């Protein structure tokens, strides 16, 4: 991440730690701050896909391409402090849903911001869909 942190992010605190503290903190200490599910997930280590994504994130951060969208299918990656400010496009099974990581997302999963299902919007029932709809056709 670039050394310049926006002023609105300086007020952010995660479990009593500022964003700067989280960025400078070793991974072992950061893991202790996470909720149990995320903590256990990270203690097991990263999968190959997660490791490749992390390498890609670090490469983009080093090059200073903060606005480049990182496309991924890895929904089970925990959002780490070094991901703040980056843009991701996470696959939801049909398309890539794009979003920017803000400090409030730390400790959550990438998949939480790419919803896989959409709200069902029922239309009018079709002809013969219900027993009463048989009589609607006769009326009209």
UniProtKB/Swiss-Prot annotation:
Family matches, as Pfam families: Ribosomal_S19
InterPro entries the UniProt entry points to: Ribosomal_uS19, Ribosomal_uS19_CS, Ribosomal_uS19_euk/arc, Ribosomal_uS19_SF
Nucleus as UniProt keyword: no
Recorded superkingdom: Archaea
Name of the coding gene: rps19
Record family assignment: Belongs to the universal ribosomal protein uS19 family.
GO molecular function list: rRNA binding; structural constituent of ribosome
Disulfide bond entries: none
GO cellular component annotations of the record: cytosolic small ribosomal subunit
Protein name: Small ribosomal subunit protein uS19
Role description: Protein S19 forms a complex with S13 that binds strongly to the 16S ribosomal RNA.
Keyword entries, A-Z: Ribonucleoprotein, Ribosomal protein, RNA-binding, rRNA-binding
One biological process term in Gene Ontology: ribosomal small subunit assembly
HAMAP family referenced in this protein's UniProt entry, alphabetically: Ribosomal_uS19
